[in-house]
């Protein structure tokens, strides 16, 4: 499947290869594709969640790799149906019953966290970064990728149009930093610069 994807970003390709090597290759990857059924995929996904203890988001990455792989096998007439169809929907439905609702930090929790960082002998130098993250809602890669030209102090705005990512190059032991544009147009945005961020 990966050899047919010429338009994948290097970081996405690296993430898929890492995911395959760490969660699929030595387990599910040893099965013959024609022998795999829906129930096998469901069991494998539950194994990853309950035994390996991966997060639901990581499982989604596994699925984003396996689903199109099986879909390609359907198109190539190796198998008739994609055994991954509907599995994530079932997993998500079951998972949402057992998972609590995520809550953002309260203002008091944010204040306590920032005070802790500011007064900590080791972490105090991270205070400006956490101030930007909390004050903008940026993702970590977006905040790390900010340049002076992205900041407009007169209009009090921050232009988010790229992010910094760190990933291992496929088939190499070298890791690289790379500036890249957001995957979608919605990722390009202008946000207000709060007083504390300024």
Regions found by a protein language model. Name each.
Residues 11, 157-159, 168-169, 179-198:
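C-terminal catalytic core of Y-nucleophile DNA break-rejoin enzymes
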Residues 56, 60-64, 75, 79-81, ...:
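Basic, Lys/Arg- and aromatic-enriched nucleic-acid-binding interface segment
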Residues 164-176:
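Compact Cys/His-rich, Zn2+-coordinating modules
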Residues 46-50, 159-165:
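Secondary-structure transition/turn motif
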Residues 26, 93-97, 178-184:
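Short glycine/proline-rich turn/loop motifs
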Residues 2-76, 83, 121-122:
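N-terminal core-binding DNA-recognition domain of tyrosine site-specific recombinases/integrases
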Residues 150:
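Phosphate-binding active sites in nucleotide-utilizing proteins
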């Amino acid at each position: 499947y990966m050899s047919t994807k010429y338009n994948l970003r290097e970081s996405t390709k690296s993430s898929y290869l890492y995911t395959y090597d760490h969660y699929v290759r030595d387990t599910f990857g040893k099965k013959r594709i024609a022998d795999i059924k829906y129930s096998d995929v469901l069991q494998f996904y539950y194994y990853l969640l309950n035994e390996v203890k991966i997060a639901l988001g990581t499982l989604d990455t596994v699925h984003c790799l396996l689903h199109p792989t099986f879909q390609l096998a359907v198109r190539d007439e190796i198998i008739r149906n994609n055994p991954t169809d509907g599995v994530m929907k079932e997993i998500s439905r079951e998972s949402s019953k057992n998972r609590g609702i995520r809550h953002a930090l309260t203002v008091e929790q944010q204040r306590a966290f920032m005070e802790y960082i500011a007064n900590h002998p080791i972490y105090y130098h991270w205070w400006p970064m956490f101030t930007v993250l909390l004050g903008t809602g940026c993702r970590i890669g977006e905040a790390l990728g900010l340049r002076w030209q992205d900041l407009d102090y007169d209009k009090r705005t921050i232009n988010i149009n790229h992010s910094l990512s760190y990933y291992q190059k496929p088939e190499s032991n070298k890791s690289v930093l790379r500036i890249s544009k957001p995957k979608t147009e919605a990722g390009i945005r202008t946000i207000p610069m709060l007083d504390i961020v300024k």
